């Protein structure tokens, strides 16, 4: 299941639409026309199926962060890329899931941040900063 979180939200939305008959603004579009932006706009308008895409992805990412915290105890998790443009639609489910899955001693400790760097630079600069400290 965790492999789905690496897919884009448009693909996840198409999969949810295929296995559900729940009403959704996304049904007005052909499957090939559904983009991550369309999912985000539908979720912002209160579309429950679109919001469930972010809830699902946030659940998977939060659980993965909880697993990571068990052996690394990070001060923060920094997210970047297009998905983070959804703001609280994705960040709140990530943090909520983390707090449900993590061991008590790590609950509520790390910060969940969105990088202010553009996606192509964020990973390289982050790795460079770690190397600089060594």
Give residue ranges: language-model regions.
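ATP-binding/phosphotransfer module of carbohydrate and carboxylate kinases, centering on a glycine-rich
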Residues: 3, 7-134
